[in-house]
């Protein structure tokens, strides 16, 4: 099914025209919903601290999670105490839930588990972002909230909107769901504060981001750096359960890894030991960091993951920090802006 969807959205498959009437209906629904918030008919809750929403206008992965991790580290370097909220995709959460270090993807979602494992940032997940944000402030006293996804969750007031675009796939065929991959029309990009292009080239007004690979690490957590080594010249099986698996495989080939087999999975797909053991056979299995957090409880010693770090320009850092300081000063002056 996912292969057919990708053909419709990104390769010009003629089935998109049959779905177009549904896209028109979706356009009306999304426009009316946003208008209700802008007109004040539906309420939007402002937070007492700045809120940065990191999202996209397309379905599927675009590089939001590496961007969130980048922002966490950037803000810490400049004296802020950030916290993160998220929906916790695929997890049935009643109320809100704090993401503790070592929490499983089954409990909190794969991306929250990965973010906390990497950064140890204060994080709360919940279906209602407003409740998650209030819990984050009450429990941890953060001075900036980063909302992982949630661009279309207008009940949460936001001060800075940052959209991440997949530089390879762009906006696909430019159509709204279900005929295309768009959650909102391309016009929405004109209303956000920052557009980050993952993989570039960045258009005017956008900031290019590159994902730089780090060292290969074992999925098993009980191995330390002195107890393992990885030979990238050996044949291996690569797997990726992310929005654009091809990007991961292309990156591995460019780095000189010898890929005997590449297996893409749906984003957020759960795994089990037998499934992946049968996939790898006796070869090393190399996966993304987001996949690794779902496999640690049953990982084999020859299962590995490759993490990436987002790289953005100093100009991006300067502009985002300047905007954030403006917002923080206004909040301290008892100004609560709702956009």
From Swiss-Prot:
Query: What chemistry does it catalyse, as a reaction equation?
Result: a lipid A disaccharide + ATP = a lipid IVA + ADP + H(+)
Matches recorded under SUPFAM superfamilies: P-loop containing nucleoside triphosphate hydrolases
Pathway(s) annotated for this protein in UniProt: Glycolipid biosynthesis; lipid IV(A) biosynthesis; lipid IV(A) from (3R)-3-hydroxytetradecanoyl-[acyl-carrier-protein] and UDP-N-acetyl-alpha-D-glucosamine: step 6/6
An individual GO BP term: lipid A biosynthetic process
Q: What is its EC number?
A: 2.7.1.130
Keywords, A to Z?
ATP-binding, Kinase, Lipid A biosynthesis, Lipid biosynthesis, Lipid metabolism, Nucleotide-binding, Transferase
GO (cellular component) term, any one: plasma membrane
Q: Where does ATP bind?
A: 58-65
Q: Does the keyword Lipid biosynthesis apply?
A: yes
Mind telling me which Pfam families this protein's record contains?
LpxK
Query: What does the record give under GO molecular function?
Result: ATP binding; tetraacyldisaccharide 4'-kinase activity
- InterPro entries cross-referenced by the UniProt entry: LpxK (IPR003758), P-loop_NTPase (IPR027417)
Family under the similarity heading:
Belongs to the LpxK family.
Function according to Swiss-Prot or TrEMBL? Transfers the gamma-phosphate of ATP to the 4'-position of a tetraacyldisaccharide 1-phosphate intermediate (termed DS-1-P) to form tetraacyldisaccharide 1,4'-bis-phosphate (lipid IVA).
The protein's name is: Tetraacyldisaccharide 4'-kinase
């Amino acid at each position: 099914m996912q292969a057919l969807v990708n053909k419709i959205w990104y390769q010009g498959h003629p089935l998109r025209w049959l779905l177009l009437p549904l896209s028109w209906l979706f356009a009306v629904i999304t426009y009316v919903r946003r208008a209700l918030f802008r007109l004040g008919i539906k309420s939007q809750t402002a937070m007492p601290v700045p809120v940065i929403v990191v999202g996209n206008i397309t379905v599927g992965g675009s590089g939001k999670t590496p961007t969130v991790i980048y922002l966490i580290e950037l803000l810490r370097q400049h004296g802020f105490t950030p916290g993160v909220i998220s929906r916790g995709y695929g997890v049935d959460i009643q109320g809100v839930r704090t993401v503790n270090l070592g929490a499983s993807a089954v409990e909190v979602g794969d991306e929250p588990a990965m973010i906390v494992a990497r950064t140890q940032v204060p994080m709360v997940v919940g279906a209602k972002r407003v409740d998650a944000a209030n819990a984050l402030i009450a429990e941890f006293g953060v001075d900036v909230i980063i909302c992982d996804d949630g661009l279309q969750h207008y009940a949460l007031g936001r001060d800075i909107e940052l959209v991440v675009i997949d530089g390879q796939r762009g906006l696909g065929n430019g159509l709204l769901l279900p005929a295309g991959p768009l959650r909102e029309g391309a016009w929405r990009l004109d209303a956000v504060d920052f557009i980050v292009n993952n993989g570039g080239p960045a258009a005017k007004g956008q900031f290019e981001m590159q994902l730089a690979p780090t060292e290969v690490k074992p999925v098993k957590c009980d191995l330390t750096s002195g107890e393992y080594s990885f030979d990238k010249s050996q044949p291996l099986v690569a797997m990726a359960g992310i929005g654009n698996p091809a990007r991961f495989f292309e990156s591995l080939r460019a780095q000189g890894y010898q890929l005997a087999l590449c297996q893409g999975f749906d984003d957020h797909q759960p795994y089990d030991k037998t499934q992946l053991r049968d996939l790898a056979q006796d070869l090393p299995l190399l996966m993304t960091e987001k996949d690794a957090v779902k496999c640690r409880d049953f990982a084999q010693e020859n299962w590995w993951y490759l993490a990436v770090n987002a790289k953005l320009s100093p100009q991006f850092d300067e502009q985002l920090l300047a905007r954030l300081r403006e917002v923080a000063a206004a909040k301290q002056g008892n100004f609560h802006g709702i956009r």
